[in-house]
Amino acid sequence: NQWKEIADYMELLIKGGGKHKYDDDNVIEVPKDETPAYLEWILWRASLAINHMVNKPYEVRGFKLDSDFLPVSAAGGGKGDLYCEFSDFTILTEVTMSTSSRQEAMEGEPVRRHVSDAVLKYDKPVYGMFIAVKIDTNTAETFRHGIWYARGDIKQRLDILPLTLAQYRKYFIAMFETGYAKPEKLRELILLCETKRDILNAPEWKTYISTAVEEQISGMEQHRCSTKKENNSVM
């Protein structure tokens, strides 16, 4: 299944690159010096697998592909990484391989600016997802507040959810294993995590996000089990 290969690529990225061998004829690889480009590429593929977008696949990404549909380089600056537009809402996904305390300095301003621009562009709710191998607590604090002043000093409260790649991978797998691979499940997670951001500090919010991921996965699994039982009883 394509989604399983996508999850395997994510696992390689979490490890910082490497190879995964299925058999002698099937090997996937993330070159260690190309992890930023591959992170954007695999999150793009994950978005296409979840599907239901109203914009075209090439409109979602800002990076270029080679003849084998592998990433040539990461997207340039000036705009967000992945714009996934659905019928009722838009999710802007930003990714980084940065894990140090410099993460907030490099990503805090541009991510908020890109989400702000998207809020002004789309005539529908816009949600941000920030995905990194590790989320620095200062980055989480910036997105917890989510404040941005647009042109004309218009104050915006942005919804940006910071997730580790491991958390996203686990949620992604659960969506497919339970038959809930749809963008609404991502929005549910974002909205659930945002409910607590005003009453928690950054370390507590990071812990709550981790708990929320597990709770949402558990809910999907329980619903799948109850649906199976109902189907069996009907038969």
Model region roles, listed by residue range:
Residues 1, 224-235:
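Nuclease-adjacent, charged terminal/linker segments that flank catalytic cores
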